Amino acid sequence: MGKTPAQKKRNQYLASVRARGASGHNLWFVRPPQDTQALPLTLSSDIELEAFFYLEGSPDVASVDYSPLRHGQARSQPGRRHFAIVTTLEGTELDVELAPEADKASVAGRRLISLSVLNAAKVRVQSWRAIVPTINRCRSHSLDPLIICCRRLLEEHGQLAVRDMCQQLASESTALVTGAVATLLRSREIESDVD
C-alpha cells in the first residue's frame, strides 16, 4: 500500500530535520513574525521552540534570520548548533548558537542560548508564545491605520495597558488592536514589561 500525499510530505520534513542532525520525534512548525517565507520554519525540539520565542522577544534584537535552519546550513560542534543570525538594534550582526550546556551567554561575535539562559527568561518565552501568534493571525489585514492610532495614543497618554488601548479604540476589532500592539512590540517601536 502506497503512502498518502500527507505521509509523503511528513516524511520529507522528517528527512530534512534528520539531515541537519536533529531528532524528528518532536516537530514544531512556526512562522517568524517578520518572515516573508511561504513555508513555516521547522523546529525539532522544545529547546529550539523556546529559543525561537526567546530571540523574537529579545528587546535588543531588531531582526532574526533563521536561514541556517531553513537551508540545512546549521553548523554543528559538539554541544552547539548554529541556530540563527541576529541583527541588534545597534546594527551588529551576531551568530546565535544553541548550546544547552554552555556556561556563558555569549562569546565574541556569537550569542549562546543555553538552558540556564532559557530558564532565566521563562516569562519572556511564555509572553512571546502568545505574541507571535497574535501577529501572525493579523498578517492578512492591513494594520497600518491601527498602528498609527496606537502610536498617537501612546504619544498622548504615555504608558497604556493593552486593555486601555482596546477601550480607547472600541470601534475597532480587539484582535486587530492587539495585533497592532504586538507588531509595534516586535518592531521594537514600543517597549513592554513582557520580560
Segments (PLM) and residue ranges:
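Electrostatic, structured charged patches in enzyme active sites and in nucleic-acid/phosphate-binding
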Residues: 1-195
